[in-house]
């Protein structure tokens, strides 16, 4: 994220209201804009193509397909991306740029294999048991694979510091998707639901191809050293578990409520809970600005303190190390408190706006009853995300693992318990899980503050560890003495 910080520093140098608004807008573009582009495209398609006139069963099939494509493409990419990101960071630090393409190829293979391993049996069930048209099933599978490739290639574009291009490629892909949908329905007279799914698949593939071309344009040399990449999965297995548990925790409460009386089943294949899922979506959007605020604040303030501490460790005096460490942790505490304060104000304003405005547009009943508790849960969850990033800064993978494990398990158990209660408390599982993860991560950061010196100076090795044949015990012979 260093590239974002450099760009933001240039923007904020002017110290004007317009500069601050520009910086906030830039942070939004590189973080949440792609998601809003996709959502906006689907909504625009629905309005222009007359989606509301489609039968209830067909709409349910489209909603279930699109929901599963997004959720499981994220879950598929989760185990690999954190480790691959760590590998690329080390490669760039060591200036071994020719090792980036092997990393890309290995990650691409692993993502496609895992996605296919999960997707093909599901699609076979959808066709054979759900009796869904084979062409529709195949198109949905292609859209799923395309989105996996999109999410995967985004990791490498961030290394190229082409954050704007990620949003631009999403915008291009979704513009083509909208044009294709209009062409298929208005000109060719094709069925609305399938035309929307096919158009989105085309848009995702176009986005993936543009990202792939950019990666290949930046990194042309290939060292063909693939074993190094695989070795990182053994060395940093905790990153695999952390990223997967955090991503699973985002959706595990939804999975629980998909098996309650809120359940909607389509074609004996897709199971989801529209009421709970919609409340979840509203709660996430209520707190989404915290991601933008966090990136802006960390890149502008904490990263500078962290860099100063790192430089002091490398070649500074003990007094310099101690002072920079104290300043760094004071800045960390300040950033967390600022994030909580700013996000609380924004979330409260958005919550009140939703409560007042949304009922006028049909959002009422159980959705608005479930929404408040989930909004609180996502508020704590995004603060937990910030703490996990700080733990990554200090290379405390054990702390991050404990936090995400507690978050995921308590969210699941709490959701199972709250599912039997009132609608108002359906989100208590997420609240309890997020608070558990937040508490573990908070105390782990405090532990790191107290034991930072041991963590930095006592965690390494004085001698290089090698695996080879043991040398002979004879170290001196009479012949050597005569020489």
Where are these regions (language model features)?
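Alpha-helical transmembrane segments of multi-pass membrane proteins
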Residues: 67-72, 109-113, 121-153, 343-350, ...
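N-terminal membrane topogenesis motif
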Residues: 1-43, 60-61, 230-239, 456-483
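Specific pore-lining/lateral-gate transmembrane helices of multi-pass inner-membrane transport
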Residues: 94-104, 277-357
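Short runs within selected transmembrane alpha-helices of multi-pass transporters and secretion channels
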Residues: 78-82, 139-160, 195-209, 350, ...
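Transmembrane helical elements of multi-pass membrane transporters/channels
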Residues: 199-299
